[in-house]
Amino acid sequence: MEDWVNAHNYAIQTGDCSYAFKYVTEDTEEYGFYKYIEILYKNGGWAVDSLDSYQSESALFYDESKKIYRMKVRRIWSTEIYIESNGGITRKANTDTSDDTFYFLYTYSNGYWKIIDSKYENEL
């Protein structure tokens, strides 16, 4: 997970998501976020602060029936600020931490652990 977090934060800082894409599948929320970041930077925008840290809250668990792995994680973040090239600003603050803990679902493919989905405990 540490390699992905480094690639994730590098993407946010630079707009170069090529490394982060290796760790997610195209149908994930994370993939859509990276496409947004790429377009933001390509059009002259940028991100301020906005970096994440993830803390493992469980061991990696293999679900034999679904043939996928899952791990409970906590996203640690404070603020996100995205500045569009036209001057528009999107600000988010982590004022409600009740949704910071969830599960990443993984597969192992082509030498990488790939995030294939994220779900809250009640969605598993």
Protein language model features and the residues they cover:
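Short structured motifs
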Residues: 53-58, 101
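Core segments of small alpha/beta cavity-forming domains
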Residues: 1-50
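Short, mixed-charge, low-aromatic patches
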Residues: 29, 58-63
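Exposed beta-sheet edge and beta->alpha loop/turn motif
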Residues: 62-124
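A mature extracytoplasmic/lumenal domain signature
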Residues: 24-27, 35, 52, 73-77, ...
